[in-house]
A protein has these predicted regions:
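Intrinsically disordered, low-complexity terminal regions
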Residues: 1-224
Length: 224
């Protein structure tokens, strides 16, 4: 009887942790919504892996190569926790949108020619990358932490959003903050830094040229 009980308990534990794989077809863009945690993993195939317990709380739609991932759980948790998470395996990825408190991250380099990142409403993107060009925008308290290498880039932080790119090696970069945004940035050749209506741009490293423009307040700082 005890052996039977242990077997039943073991099966329940196994089933509760079983993973489900979804073949969503090829995609090069992703959009995440509503406090969901998404790990990006480079792969030879495109797929989404999730826990079976989360399957009923996640909607996945691939429309014209743009994969939308949404948490449909009505009872959302605190800002420091995520009840629903998925792993996204991708072949090529050049655009990431994080919305409504979602969290997107990678532990391995995302390699592409051009990368576009957008985050809003308290969302977070933490990405390691190797690219030629990046466009990154944050709004409404969203944050980004970017690491790796990019030849050129355009970074924009609005309305309390923040971009930490001091560990992303640029040759040339444009950094613009509006209405209380914050950007930490590093480049070897040129930084074009602009502040409007408050906010700060903090410049790391020793770029050869720094072009500063301030309108209606804000700070541009050289960090040694």
């Amino acid at each position: 009887m005890k052996n039977l009980l242990f077997t039943v308990v073991g099966l329940i534990a196994f089933n509760s942790q079983a993973q489900v794989t979804k073949d969503m077809g090829d995609f090069s863009e992703i959009r995440t919504t509503n406090r969901i945690k998404v790990e990006l993993i480079p792969s030879s195939e495109s797929k989404v892996v999730l826990d079976s317990k989360d399957e009923s709380n996640i909607t996945l739609v691939n429309k014209n190569g743009k994969l939308a991932i949404k948490n449909t759980l009505k009872e959302l948790v605190s800002d420091s926790d995520y009840k629903v998470s998925v792993k996204v395996y991708y072949k090529n990825l050049n655009s990431i949108e994080a919305e409504s408190g979602s969290y997107v991250f990678s532990s391995k380099n995302l390699e592409t020619t051009k990368l576009k990142l957008n985050a809003n409403s308290g969302s977070q993107i933490d990405i390691k990358m190797k690219t030629k060009n990046i466009e990154a925008k944050v709004f409404a308290g969203a944050t980004m932490k970017l690491e790796g290498k990019s030849d050129t880039g355009t970074l924009i932080a609005n309305a309390g959003g923040a971009i930490d790119a001091k560990n992303l090696d640029f040759i040339t970069v444009d950094a613009t903050v509006n209405a209380g945004g914050k950007i930490d940035v590093k480049a070897t050749e040129t930084v074009n830094a602009t502040t409007r209506a408050g906010g700060s741009v903090n410049i790391y490293g020793n770029p050869k040229t720094v072009v500063e423009k301030t309108t209606a307040g804000g700070n541009i700082n050289r960090v040694k």
